[in-house]
């Protein structure tokens, strides 16, 4: 029950983004309540983290505390930070407090929800694992996503993370009638702006009719205080939960970057008086991660499928953040610079990407055996590459030459033209059903297409298109 009377306190101590605030006896705010601090720079929103005793609370600020003084008035709002939800959020950019930051005026949304909410009850969860078809061959065949699952997206700069994300947003809207929420957690402001502009250009955001857009954006960027970066993931998740629970839709939630979410928590952890744990991270790392991840799930009415970019500090997979994140992931999509250099897009590494869904009991024997055969062919090709580089292709046995030929066709057939890249490439995008993808790879593996040139398989949709392309190349 939210209290209607608002108690007033005053700031007694300021240490960076952390404030100590004294309240009158018996009028202490609850943990996670939002507080409004009246400063000369305007109103600052804080969130209560600890009750210290002696009628004092410790809170973390969601915006900069520059210019703040001791003694200024603080008002307890009586409830947690609440953000607008619903279709009015589509096509807009919000900050951690749910305030629009795109200069397109206020949001008309009548509904708001608090950012701290319990995970769905166990009885409401969808227990049968279902494949979430993306229409992207390499993903659906070799590392399929689970509906309501969590996927880690690993890749350096410039290998196509953003384009892959935009294609997934586009495909979920077209194939599943779903929407997406993008949470920019502690990443570069410039990249956030570029993403917004590219989304407008590729019509993922419809500037003329915002409600027809397919995505809502929530940003808490690198230049913002840790409080904002620590909570912006929850703001994005809350908006996604509304689409799942009330609109009963399939939702894609992107978190870029999950590492920054933990990093922000570690920045304020010591200021809150907690003893640091391994590598200087907060002792509550696993709890904070679990509270976020457990809300991302599939219920009997809708689903939130989450794709999380994972920054791996110093490429050390044993670092507490990647290690804790891995425990929650159902699949990993690894982008490879070598494939990007060859011009094979999406540059998803077929051998490094994994999925817990790739089991015969879930995907069926046909899908599983095709995927395993594709992987073993590519693995054999990888082993033979050193021999080819030194001795040449002619020194290989007949069988190995055939394997290399098929592997090169498979490698090219794993590429695909994207809808969102049409603007840049001029070739129309293709959505390939899982059934068509399996059929195509089986034909290559069986040797039915050995006589076709490998270039015919490059940047096509299904196998019929590759055959047509080969025919046109003959002409």
From Swiss-Prot:
GO terms for molecular function: ATP binding; ATP hydrolysis activity; proton-transporting ATP synthase activity, rotational mechanism. InterPro entries: AAA+_ATPase, ATP-synt_VA_C, ATP_synth_F1_bsu, ATPase_a/bsu_AS, ATPase_alpha/beta_chains, ATPase_F1/V1/A1_a/bsu_N, ATPase_F1/V1/A1_a/bsu_N_sf, ATPase_F1/V1/A1_a/bsu_nucl-bd. GO terms for cellular component: chloroplast thylakoid membrane; mitochondrion; proton-transporting ATP synthase complex. Transmembrane segments: none annotated. Keywords: ATP synthesis, ATP-binding, CF(1), Chloroplast, Hydrogen ion transport, Ion transport, Membrane, Nucleotide-binding, Plastid, Thylakoid, Translocase, Transport. One of its GO terms (biological process) is proton motive force-driven mitochondrial ATP synthesis. ATP binds at residues 155-162. It holds the Pfam family ATP-synt_ab_N. Its EC number is 7.1.2.2. It is a peripheral membrane protein. CDD domains: ATP-synt_F1_beta_C, ATP-synt_F1_beta_N, F1-ATPase_beta_CD. It is found in: Plastid, Chloroplast thylakoid membrane. F-type ATPases have 2 components, CF(1) - the catalytic core - and CF(0) - the membrane proton channel. CF(1) has five subunits: alpha(3), beta(3), gamma(1), delta(1), epsilon(1). CF(0) has four main subunits: a(1), b(1), b'(1) and c(9-12). Produces ATP from ADP in the presence of a proton gradient across the membrane. The catalytic sites are hosted primarily by the beta subunits. Belongs to the ATPase alpha/beta chains family. This is ATP synthase subunit beta, chloroplastic. It comes from Pyropia yezoensis.
């Amino acid at each position: 029950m939210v209290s209607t009377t608002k108690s007033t306190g005053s700031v007694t101590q300021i240490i960076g983004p952390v404030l100590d605030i004294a309240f009158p006896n018996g009028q202490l705010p609850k943990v996670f309540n939002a507080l409004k601090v009246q400063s000369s720079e305007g109103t600052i929103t804080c969130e209560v983290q600890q009750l210290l005793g002696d009628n004092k609370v410790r809170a973390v600020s969601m915006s900069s505390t520059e210019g703040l003084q001791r003694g200024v008035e603080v008002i307890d709002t009586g409830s947690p930070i609440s953000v607008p939800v619903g279709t009015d959020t589509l096509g807009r950019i919000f900050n951690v407090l749910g305030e629009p930051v795109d200069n397109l005026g206020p949001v008309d949304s009548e509904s708001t929800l608090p950012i701290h909410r319990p995970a769905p009850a166990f009885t409401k969860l969808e227990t049968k694992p279902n494949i979430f078809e993306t229409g992207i061959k390499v993903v659906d065949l070799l590392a399929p996503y689970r509906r309501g699952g969590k996927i880690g997206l690993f890749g350096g700069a410039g290998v196509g993370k953003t384009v892959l994300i935009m294609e997934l947003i586009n495909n979920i809207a077209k194939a599943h009638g779903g929407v997406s929420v993008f949470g920019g957690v502690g990443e570069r402001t410039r990249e956030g702006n570029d993403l917004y502009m590219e989304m407008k250009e590729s019509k993922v955001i419809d500037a003329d009719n915002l409600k027809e857009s397919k995505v809502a954006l929530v940003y808490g960027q690198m230049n913002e205080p840790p409080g904002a970066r620590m909570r912006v993931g929850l703001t994005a998740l809350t908006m996604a939960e509304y689409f799942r629970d009330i609109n009963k839709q399939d939702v894609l939630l992107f978190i870029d970057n999950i590492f920054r979410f933990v990093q922000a928590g570690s920045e304020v952890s010591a200021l809150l008086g907690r003893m640091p744990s391994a590598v200087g991270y907060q002792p509550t790392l696993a709890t904070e991660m679990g509270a976020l991840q457990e809300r991302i799930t599939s219920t009997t009415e809708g689903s939130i499928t989450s794709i999380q970019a994972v920054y791996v500090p110093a490429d050390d997979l044993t670092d507490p953040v990647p290690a804790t994140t891995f425990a929650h992931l159902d699949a990993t999509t690894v982008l490879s610079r070598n494939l990007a250099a060859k011009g094979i897009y999406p540059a998803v590494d077929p051998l490094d990407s994994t999925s817990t869904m790739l089991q015969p009991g879930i995907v069926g024997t046909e899908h599983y055996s095709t995927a395993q055969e594709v992987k073993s062919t590519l693995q054999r090709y990888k082993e033979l590459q050193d021999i080819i580089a030194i001795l040449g292709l002619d020194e290989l046995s007949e069988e190995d030459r055939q394997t290399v030929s098929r592997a090169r066709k498979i490698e090219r057939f794993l590429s695909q033209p994207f809808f969102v890249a049409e603007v840049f490439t001029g070739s129309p995008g293709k959505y390939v059903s899982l059934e068509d993808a399996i059929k195509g790879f089986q034909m290559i593996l069986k040797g039915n297409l050995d006589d076709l040139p490998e270039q015919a398989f490059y940047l096509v949709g299904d196998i019929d298109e590759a055959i047509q392309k080969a025919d046109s190349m003959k002409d």
